[in-house]
């Protein structure tokens, strides 16, 4: 009998459930927005793990390559709001270099630098470049919009937003309402599906 081998997507999902996810029957977790939720997702507990880095790099790189093929144009760089997007952007940059098609990384500050050039963005800088905004988890969309604003200040052309987890709490709809495309590797429902399966 053949045993099913976990795909990279399965492997990363299991790491997220194990290290980054808590859930409750009642909304007991307070989010950054002040709202209460049944779910607590701290993606950084997974994205900073050595075991997760190759999986993150591969999964996001594959999504970006699919987008490039669709548009017929290359993506120059990936990045998002520090700190959540940073390890994902670095993983993508490293993976892309290994495959001979480098995609650069950048990091968007939460506030512009208070001295010197007062920059919003560190790392890759090329006005007009096509970039993908990376997000670890999308809830209301507020932090993603802040990252987009910083990237626009740097002169980037935003192609799409690519998130690790969509909490399915209105963030996707808010970004779309503002005219931004978004896709996610996982949703909260994907994480809960693993939890339910483990409980069987």
Summary of predicted features, one role per range:
Residues 89-132, 142-145, 198-199:
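Short, glycine/charge-rich flexible loops or terminal/linker lids adjacent to PRPP-binding catalytic cores
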Residues 1-70:
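Active-site-facing substrate-recognition patch
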Residues 80-84, 109, 138-139:
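Active-site nucleophile and cofactor-binding loops and adjacent substrate-binding regions
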Residues 2-18, 149-200:
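PRPP-dependent phosphoribosyltransferase catalytic core
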Residues 68, 96, 155:
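Active-site catalytic pocket residues across diverse enzymes, especially alpha/beta-hydrolases
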Residues 78-79, 106, 159, 183:
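Structural detector of well-ordered beta-strand residues that form the stable sheet scaffold
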Residues 71-84, 160-162:
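Short glycine-rich phosphate-binding loop at a beta-alpha junction
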Residues 137-148, 170-171:
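Acidic, divalent-metal-coordinating active-site segment for phosphoryl/phosphodiester hydrolysis
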């Amino acid at each position: 009998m053949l045993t099913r081998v976990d795909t990279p997507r399965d492997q990363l999902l299991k790491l997220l459930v194990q290290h980054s996810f808590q859930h409750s029957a009642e909304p007991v977790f307070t989010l950054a927005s002040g709202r209460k939720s049944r779910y607590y997702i701290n993606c950084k507990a997974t994205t900073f793990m050595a075991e997760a880095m190759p999986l993150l790099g591969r999964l996001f790189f594959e999504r970006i390559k699919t987008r490039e093929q669709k548009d017929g144009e290359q993506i120059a760089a990936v990045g998002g709001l520090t700190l959540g997007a940073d390890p994902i952007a670095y993983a993508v940059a490293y993976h892309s270099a290994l495959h001979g098609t480098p995609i650069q990384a950048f990091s968007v500050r939460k506030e512009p630098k208070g001295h010197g050039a007062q920059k919003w963005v560190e790392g890759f800088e090329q006005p007009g470049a096509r970039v993908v905004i990376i997000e670890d988890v999308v809830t209301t969309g507020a932090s993603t919009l802040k990252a987009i604003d910083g990237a626009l200040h740097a002169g980037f052309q935003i192609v799409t937003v690519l998130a690790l987890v969509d909490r399915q709490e209105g963030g996707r709809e808010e970004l779309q309402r503002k005219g931004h495309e978004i896709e996610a590797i996982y949703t909260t429902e994907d994480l809960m599906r693993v939890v339910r399966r483990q409980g069987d």
